[in-house]
């Protein structure tokens, strides 16, 4: 019953913020090409979602690695839809890369469009990469970062699986750093039956960024494996420290 009430509250809250975002987009468009105003409204929405339940805890580590004046390609592990709001604890203006099917979800898809997120068709790999590079470089040029799940899909067992090359190709072509982010605890916030777990802790850790010079010079596959290993090691350490 409590979960149903909170879901209803979230629908009303998201509707309100969606209207605010549409107004902000129109009003700020002439001088806000990176859609920072819309993104900041999304951050307020996310903070509200996480802060109301009294026994939900969020721990954020490694923010000293974040330069708010830089654009990054953000890579993070993917377990559940809760990964998306959790990333808003990182103080950067970013655009998500998401599969086309998500943009077709009523209400949520419209929110992604307002936010300016990047839609790709995973069924057409070459076209998806072209779209990612074109749209990703556009947003980076405007001063935003781009957030990507390099595994390409959710992990069923909670481990970090093999990375795809798209995020690393974008970082190399755009000449920006890669910012690895590791999440733990998002998978347990919603139970398998769809009800909320009212006692939950999420930990987000930002790892040191990968310099653009290293991305440009190092073998792409070796670089992907190195970042993967660093993130996996961080996840194991976070779990040991629960």
Q: Model-found features: residue ranges?
A:
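Catalytic core of membrane glycerolipid acyltransferases/transacylases, capturing the structured
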Residues: 21-40, 52-53, 68-125
